[in-house]
Curated annotation (Swiss-Prot):
It catalyses: RNA(n) + a ribonucleoside 5'-triphosphate = RNA(n+1) + diphosphate. Keywords: DNA-directed RNA polymerase, Nucleotidyltransferase, Transcription, Transferase. HAMAP family: RNApol_bact_RpoB. The lineage of its organism: Bacteria, Pseudomonadati, Pseudomonadota, Gammaproteobacteria, Pasteurellales. This is DNA-directed RNA polymerase subunit beta. GO terms for cellular component: DNA-directed RNA polymerase complex. Its EC number is 2.7.7.6. Gene3D superfamilies: 2.40.50.100, 2.40.50.150, 3.90.1100.10, 6.10.140.1670, DNA-directed RNA polymerase, beta subunit, external 1 domain (2.30.150.10), DNA-directed RNA polymerase, subunit 2, domain 6 (2.40.270.10), RNA polymerase alpha subunit dimerisation domain (3.90.1800.10). DNA-dependent RNA polymerase catalyzes the transcription of DNA into RNA using the four ribonucleoside triphosphates as substrates. PROSITE patterns: RNA_POL_BETA.
Length: 1342
């Protein structure tokens, strides 16, 4: 494999046996593609804004004289860029302008004659734009819209599994779910009558729906039943025989024909009997007259002579009726064919329950059910029913719904529209009856073929459409008022409802979430999250086990591991690594096609529906060098997701990769295959909580997924085009682009500005550090600068720590850990947290609040860190209680005492009519001020500090743009110089002339002269562009800020807090092995090995066996080997051994094992080998892919190569006594994470605080400044000890005895240490509650 310059800096050795055929796809595709489809104009009108506009427009007035037509739309440019929106607290959005046409028709002339046309661009609010990383900036905060997994539109057949009725009878139902519109349900009741419900309302007999569709009783019976024909001949009754129908029946009479008895009375009719009847060609048999009694007539029988209805359809035939029919001259009778086995009389029975008799009565019944209390009219009833299922405005199955509907009912694809037809409804009822009759199966609603993904674009389109529909009503009313002279489309349209709908969705929808920005992995995972909750989805309380469970169709689509613990388990999932959505919104996953046992290179994506029809082999099946299966039988997933053994020639597809099952976070866990699933779940979830450390450290033992995640997360800077690094400093990287990648006529310079010390949503620090040097070549897509938690373009969430598994004086009891002081000294787990504190000056009733350094009753020392405007200076180190922004608020006039009047007279007015409301540092926080922002309302004069900040921003902007111009000019003038030298101008002359003069030269060669003129034009354009950009920047900086009503000024202060690791902080590995630090131990007391190397963390070995996460042990062994090889390389470098030996040793390490990766160091120059060796000194980075990882022999081989014992265990010595521990200990390197559960954020101390209003007990929690709850178990403990007085004060004066605690405070102040406990307030509450029940309780006083 050929490596690029920057890839050669550090190569991760992979143990993967399977070659990676398909690169990991771009991880944010699901977000970006979906929103792209929403915003970009789709000329077919199938999706996005275009579809929304076309579904609502044209809007026609009620009298048809005018209509408002939609022509096209365009999105403008956003006013501020993403960064500016975050600073200013505004939404990153673009204005939407729609071209509308108002057409007025001439009512006197022929229909369709146009009288007047007005066309105009109408502003329709702002549409939030997605940033490059798949997020939205709403009101200054980054948010993510999580995709939703909802029930696909279509028809579903289900059963209650016998839970509804006490008899345990299984009741079947069918539900037609449209994308938009009313639901239609059909269900059986315990008596086997078929009922219908509309929108889950009161149930009606299903035949009412059929009558409302215009069917008569006779037509209904013909549609749902087969007929049996009886003939009356010479007072005999003959039945036309269809032998197959008799199967399973018990003969009620001797079945005989031509004198031969085929079945005796009372015998069951078997398949043998039927075959005999068919062989003998028996087509009719004589039946006793009683046999027809009780059968149901299939149609109306009328006495033609009198016109009397002798036997209505769906009536049981009696002897009297039979006589009448015979008299009326009927020779043939049609009855319904039913039996108990597989032709139930359900519709016939339902018709008897149905009280309606024709279409109108059915429509009236439906109207009464839908609109109770309203008097029905014929027109209203018809309009209601038609609008419900047959109007494209009110009902839409959508393309997905129609596809699912047709598949379910075996209708050819492409037939039908978004609305229902009579055949659709009858088809559903027929299939439901078939299922009840025992033919056909119910659907599995948890199958991923029945659940689809609804992503950002689709949800935004639905919200936008809701807004448009609201506008439509208003426009139609306005058009119908007449008098449209001089009215333009802009006058008709009010954009507020549209903006409101969009704003509500992005701002407060359940699926619009505050982005989890702890680290790059948490960002990526949040964007790939799939939630079953949210509008139109499930609710936590109603979701049962089945929905939450892992389903066979999740394979390769949704991760079976990564889901939250707690009430949301199984409802929130994560997309698997290779999964994507298809056009219908169903999840697909890639497979290799297999032909005759030969795995081909062809890759196909299959959805869950398609995969069910094939046999799929696993990715780790054994193949020979020609990619043929070597085993006689291969373990595969067969039809319906069941696993079994299959022959190679029966296999259709093979998995693409071993990590295709799991999500991005689970794919980061090395040796996942050796961890228990519950612990793997915790490991995947805890990686998302890791805080970026001060210096990122790549994992020694990884899985190879670290690079794609870091690249796709967007936290690092990636080269857009290849080139050479021309300039690099802490805040900017400049790349001179390769000639073959430049566009003709451009300067060929790419400038990347780095993000420095910015606050994330979780208050962690976002900072980018260049990882390239001057003059280095870079290729397109390579990393230029590392972001938080990335190291040379690889995800680095924690630190490689030397761990030992052994008990140590009880300090690692119950998952706690003992940490060496060295870890603290080296700042291994030091993190920077940035807090934003804001101070708002408002206009109050008593006057405006003022930000000032002149604060009453505050000493000089407290003001020492403020400037003259009353705002803290940047760089100040502050601690809890310090003033950051001085602010005074006017207070109301009060009556003054004579003393106060005197003081006022002496010290002047100011002192008393304002109170101090300054912004102070919260208690328990200390840090450094790293930035201050001042926002001022337009009408308010800017203070000195605001002007200083403005000037500084202007200077910065000008400096940035000037530098940019200089770089671009330098590139341009280099090309001019080369051109002039080629044309014969001497270098000496050029050096003596100012660069601008070069462009005025005239050349003999016409082509070169043209080139020179082009370059001169470009130079002019560059200067103009510079001026334009500067002007825009200047205007943005100078203009006033758009603040909330009543707000005059906002000051934001950013504090950087440096947090070292300390006891009480939570740490974890990647295998769900979490714990809390119990003690920071001096280095000299830590156990050490025979080389004097102390361990850094001591873990409890008892945390492993019961938890079954053995992956951590294997990781420790492999980590030790990786570090051992690093140490060997380090020793060789220190001994200054020659490069060939170094090359040989490193090559040996890369060649070890049976991995498919090939690293050929012979293609590297000596310099490149040395650079690689320098980067490997701290250990050889290894990749052990999920389910395809390192084997025991490979781990032992590496340990041997590193000169370490192959057992992975080392003799340790006690640091305090120097004695040897009695047995060898497992020591190695484990990747440890510091989680965002820091003791500093959790611990607080309550002094005088707030009390609950009713119970008068202290509140709980840090946010409420609450106390510790003394719960019932604690009370039992004190009771058990007999500590009566302690218990008494706990339950009274220290809690809710109001008078007692007041007296006690007074006593302490007076110095008398006594207490008088009284009645706790909670007892009074109990008394009141008992009285509320009407029971009077009185307390006797002794």
């Amino acid at each position: 494999m050929a490596y690029s310059y920057s890839e050669k800096k550090r190569i991760r050795k992979s143990f993967g046996k399977r070659p990676q055929v398909l690169n990991v796809p771009y991880l944010l595709t699901i977000q970006l593609d979906s929103y792209e489809k929403f915003i970009h104009r789709d000329l077919d009108g199938q999706q996005g804004l275009e579809a929304a506009f076309r579904s609502v427009f044209p809007i026609v007035s009620n009298n048809g004289s005018t209509e408002l037509q939609y022509v096209s739309y365009e999105l403008g440019e956003p006013v501020f860029d993403v960064r500016e929106c975050q600073i200013r607290g505004t939404t990153y959005a673009a204005p939407l302008r729609v071209k509308l046409r108002l057409v007025a028709f001439d009512r006197e002339a022929a229909a369709g004659t146009v009288k007047d046309i007005k066309e105009q661009n109408v502003y329709m609010g702002e549409i939030p734009l997605m940033t490059d990383n798949g997020t939205f900036v709403i009101n200054g905060t980054e948010r993510v819209i999580v995709s939703q997994l909802h029930r696909s539109p279509g028809v579903f057949f289900d059963s209650d599994k016998g839970k509804t009725h006490s008899s345990g009878k299984v009741l079947y139902n069918a539900r037609i779910i449209p994308y938009r519109g009313s639901w239609l349900d059909f269900e059986f009741d315990p008596k086997d009558n078929l009922y219908a419900r509309i929108d889950r309302r009161r149930k009606l007999p299903a035949t009412i729906i059929l009558r409302a569709l215009g069917y008569t009783t006779e037509e209904i019976l013909t549609m749902f039943f087969e007929k049996v024909l009886f003939e009356i001949q010479d007072n005999k009754l003959l039945m036309i025989l269809v032998p197959e129908r008799l199967r399973g029946e018990t003969a009620a009479f001797d079945i005989e024909a031509n004198g031969k008895i085929y079945v005796e009375r009372g015998r069951r009719i078997t398949a043998r009997h039927i075959r005999t009847l068919e062989k003998d060609g028996i087509t009719q048999i004589e039946v006793p007259v009683e046999y027809i009694v009780g059968k149901v007539a299939a149609k109306d029988y009328v006495d033609l002579s009198t016109g009397e209805l002798v036997c209505p359809a769906n009536t049981e035939i009696s002897m009297d009726m039979l006589a009448k029919l015979s008299q009326a001259g009927y020779k043939e009778l049609e009855v319904l064919f039913t039996n108990d086995l597989d032709h139930g009389p359900y519709i016939s029975e339902t018709l008897r329950v149905d009280s309606t008799y024709d279409r109108l009565s059915a429509l009236v019944e439906i109207y009464r059910m839908m609109r109770p209390g309203e008097p029905p009219t014929k027109e209203a009833a018809e309009a209601l029913f038609d609008n419900m299922f047959f109007s494209a405005d009110r009902y839409d199955l959508s393309a997905v719904g129609r596809m699912k509907f047709n598949r379910s009912l075996n209708i050819p694809e492409g037939v039908g529209t978004g609305i229902l037809t009579n055949d659709d409804i009858t088809g559903v009822m027929k299939k439901l009856i078939e299922i009840r009759n025992g033919r056909g199966e119910v659907d599995d609603i948890d199958h991923l073929g029945n659940r689809r993904i609804r992503s950002v674009g689709e949800m935004a389109e639905n919200q936008f459409r809701i807004g448009l529909v609201r506008v439509e009503r208003a426009v139609r009313e306005r058009l119908s008022l007449g008098d449209l002279d001089g009215i333009t489309p802009q006058d008709l349209i009010n954009a507020k409802p549209i903006s409101a709908a969009v704003k509500e969705f992005f701002g407060s929808s359940q699926l619009s979430q505050f982005m989890d920005q702890n680290n790059p992995l948490s960002e990526v995972t949040h964007k790939r999250r799939i939630s079953a909750l949210g509008p139109g989805g499930l609710t936590r309380e109603r979701a049962g086990f089945e929905v939450r469970d892992v389903h066979p169709t999740h394979y390769g689509r949704l991760c079976p591991i990564e889901t939250p613990e707690g009430p949301n388990i199984g409802l929130i999932n994560s997309l698997s690594v290779y999964a994507r959505t298809n056009n219908y919104g169903f999840l697909e996953t890639p497979f290799h096609k297999v032909v005759n046992g030969q795995v081909t290179e062809e890759i196909e994506y299959l959805s869950a529906i398609e995969e069910g029809n094939y046999v799929v082999a696993q990715a780790n099946s054994n193949l020979d060098e020609h990619f043929r299966f070597t085993d006689t039988y291969v373990t595969c997933r067969g039809e319906h997701g069941e696993s079994g053994l299959y022959k190679p020639e029966d296999i259709h597809y093979m998995d693409i990769s071993t990590q295709q099952v799991v999500s991005v976070a689970a794919a980061l866990i090395p040796f996942l295959e050796h961890d228990d699933a519950n612990r793997a779940l915790m490991g995947a979830n805890m990686q998302r909580q890791a805080v970026p450390t001060l210096r990122a450290d790549k994992p020694l033992v990884g899985t190879g997924m670290e690079k794609p995640i870091a690249l796709d997360s967007g936290v690092a800077i990636v080269a857009k085009r290849g080139g050479i690094i021309q300039r690099v400093d802490a805040s900017r990287i400049v790349v001179k682009v390769n000639e073959d990648e430049t566009i003709p006529g451009e300067a060929g310079i790419d400038i990347y500005n780095l993000i420095k010390y910015t606050r994330s949503n979780q208050n962690t620090c976002i900072n980018q550090i260049p990882c390239v040097n001057l003059g280095e070549p870079v290729a397109r897509g390579e990393i230029l600068a590392d972001g938080p938690s990335t190291d040379l373009g690889e995800l680095a969430l924690g630190q490689n720590i030397r761990v030992a598994f052994m008990p140590w004086n009880g300090y690692n009891f119950e998952d706690s850990m003992l940490v060496s002081e060295r870890v603290v000294q080296e700042d291994r787990f030091t993190t920077i947290h940035i807090q934003e504190l804001s101070c708002v000056a408002r206009d109050t009733k008593l006057g405006a609040e003022e930000i000032t350094a002149d604060i009453p009753n505050v000493g000089e020392s407290a003001l020492s860190k403020l400037d003259e405007s009353g705002i803290v200076y940047v760089g100040a180190e502050v601690k809890g209680g310090d003033i950051l922004v001085g602010k005074v608020t006017p207070k109301g006039e009060t009556q003054l005492t004579p003393e106060e009047k005197l003081l006022r007279a002496i010290f002047g007015e100011k002192a008393s009519d304002v109170k101090d409301s300054s912004l102070r540092v919260p208690n328990g926080t200390s840090g450094t001020v790293i930035d201050v922002q001042v926002f001022t309302r337009d009408s308010v004069e800017k203070d000195k500090r605001a002007l200083e900040i403005e000037e500084m921003q202007l200077r910065e902007a000008k400096k940035d743009l000037t530098e940019e111009l200089e770089i671009l000019e330098a590139g341009l003038f280099t090309r001019v110089r080369n051109l002039l030298i080629e044309s014969g101008v001497s270098e000496v002359n050029l050096n003596n002339v100012a660069r601008e003069k070069w462009l005025e030269q005239t050349l003999d060669d016409e082509a070169k002269q043209n080139q020179l003129e082009q370059l001169a034009e470009q130079h002019e354009e560059l200067c103009k562009e510079f001026e334009r950009k500067l002007e825009i920047k200047r205007n943005k900086i100078i203009q006033g800020d758009d603040l909330a009503p009543g707000v005059l000024k906002v000051v934001k202060v950013y504090l950087a807090v440096r947090r070292q690791i300390q006891p009480g902080d939570k740490m974890a590995g990647r295998h769900g092995n979490k714990g809390v630090i119990s003690k920071i131990n001096p280095v000299e007391d830590m156990p050490y090995d025979e080389n004097g190397e102390p361990v850094e963390i001591v873990l409890n070995p008892l945390g492993v066996p019961s938890r079954m996460n053995i992956g951590q042990i294997l990781e420790t062994h492999l980590g030790l080997a990786a570090r051992g090889i690093g140490d060997q390389i380090n020793a060789m470098i220190k001994q200054q051994q020659e490069v060939t030996k170094l090359r040989e040793y490193i090559q040996k390490a890369y060649d070890l094992g049976h991995g498919s990766q090939v690293v050929d160091l012979s293609t590297f120059t000596d310099e490149e080998v040395m650079r690689l060796a320098q980067n490997l000194r701290k250990g050889l980075p290894l990749a052990t892919p999920v389910f395809d990882g390192a084997h025991e022999a490979e781990i032992k081989g590496l340990l041997e190569l590193g000169g370490l014992p192959t057992s992975g265990q080392i003799t340790l010595f006690d640091g305090r006594t120097g004695e040897k521990f009695e047995r060898p200990v497992t020591v190695g390197y484990m990747y440890m994470l510091k989680l965002n559960h820091l003791v500093d954020d959790k611990m607080h101390a309550r002094s005088t605080g707030s009390y609950s209003l009713v119970t008068q007990q202290p509140l709980g929690g840090k946010a409420q400044f609450g106390g510790q709850r003394f719960g019932e178990m604690e009370v039992w403990a004190l009771e058990a000890y007999g500590a009566a007085y302690t218990l008494q004060e706990m339950l009274t004066v220290k809690s809710d005895d109001v008078n007692g605690r007041t007296k006690m405070y007074k006593n302490i102040v007076d110095g008398t240490h006594q207490m008088e406990p009284g009645m706790p307030e909670s007892f009074n509450v109990l008394l009141k509650e008992i009285r509320a029940l009407g029971i009077d309780m009185e307390l006797d006083e002794d």
